[in-house]
Regions:
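Ligand-binding clefts of soluble mixed alpha/beta catalytic domains
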Residues: 1-232
């Protein structure tokens, strides 16, 4: 394994498997706090501008060298706030999404924890056509977290001035909305609707990925690799 970039909120590596003869590129977000040289302390499960930029260049490199890509997701999304905007999160995030969405090499995604919002897209969610999407049994798959989503839906439903409800009714409505969202974020809900290809035991991940790579890496894709305009 050659460590292409670590010490960031996203880690990308090249790895060669002697038993299969396959080399692959791995992209995964960190689930621990990281001390970045450029932007200080970075929180776990969030994509920052420097790591998005580095990952985008790594994905471009894998496409040039025709390396299959494996993404591991446990991500809440991109970092927000004034400091994140000053660091160029919009430009770097767009570059990462551009690189992932236009990749022509085989892509495989494994959801090992949460997969929320734009982070799902950045690490090759369903919309960007990975050859396979696998998930661990504990995985969550949604636009945003249950607390935030239930607040948004609750506000919309109670905005009608003609609908008068007692405090008890409002509390019951909020609780129902949140529970519905929790149920629908469960990976079994998504798997039943074809959002993932299989729910796999964590200890079988290696064997499943080796089989998936053997299926996905051949034949070589014929499409050329072309990205949109990238801001540098």
């Amino acid at each position: 394994m050659s460590n292409w970039s670590s010490g960031r909120s996203l880690t990308v590596t090249r790895e060669a498997r002697e038993e299969t003869g396959l080399a692959v590129g791995l992209a995964a977000n960190q689930r621990q706090r990281v001390q970045s040289k450029t932007s200080g302390l970075q929180m776990p499960g969030v994509i920052y501008a420097d790591s998005a930029d580095k990952a985008a260049r790594f994905i471009l490199d894998c496409n040039q060298t025709r390396l299959p890509l494996i993404f591991f997701q446990d991500v809440s999304g991109f970092m927000v706030g004034k400091d994140a905007e000053h660091s160029g999160i919009i430009r770097s995030g767009a570059k990462l999404v551009n690189a992932v969405s236009n990749s022509t090499v085989p892509k495989i995604t494994v959801i090992v924890g949460g997969s929320y919002g734009a982070g799902n897209y950045a690490l090759c969610g369903k919309a960007f056509d990975p050859r396979f999407i696998f998930a661990w049994p504990n995985a969550k798959y949604a636009v945003m977290g249950p607390a935030q989503a239930s607040d948004v839906v609750f506000t919309i439903l109670t905005r009608n001035p003609g609908a008068e409800r007692t405090p008890a009714e409002l509390a019951a409505l909020r609780a129902k909305i949140k529970q519905d969202y929790v149920d629908q974020a469960d990976i079994r809900y998504g798997a039943a609707r074809g959002w993932v290809d299989a729910i796999i035991p964590p200890h079988d991940t290696r064997a499943v990925l080796l089989t998936a790579l053997a299926c996905a890496a051949r034949p070589a894709p014929k499409a050329g690799f072309h990205t949109g305009v990238l801001q540098v």
